[in-house]
Amino acid sequence: ANGSQNNAINFDGGNYSMETTDKLLDIEKWRDTLSKILQYYGNIPYRYGDVKTFVIISQGRNHFMLLHEGWQKRRHVYGTIVHAEIRHEQIWIYYDGIEDGITDELVAAGVPKDRIVLAFHPPDVREYTGYGVG
């Protein structure tokens, strides 16, 4: 024993460093935060027609979507309101149709701005958004 400390934690037979464990905890928190944000917006009724809102979450693949579908008079309404994914230790927002966006809510929940990628902007523009570049 040379006095050094082993900072590994054992989960289900796998060894994860403290840094990896912290990242896993962050990702779990981000999943919960994204789920709560989408559930909140999913509970807001559509104003016109017979249109329902759906929250679709693929925890295993880390995809989070808010969709609407239905009828407004004789017109079929269908579309993505929000699509986000947790990948490479960042939240990638592919589409955000919420009026003020969900980024402020993510930041208020403790997600660092450099961990949020506004993927609907071209890669060469992202560095000017104040968020992550991916």
Where are these regions (language model features)?
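Accessible peptide chain termini
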Residues: A1-N2, M18
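Terminal domain-initiation and capping elements
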Residues: I9-G134
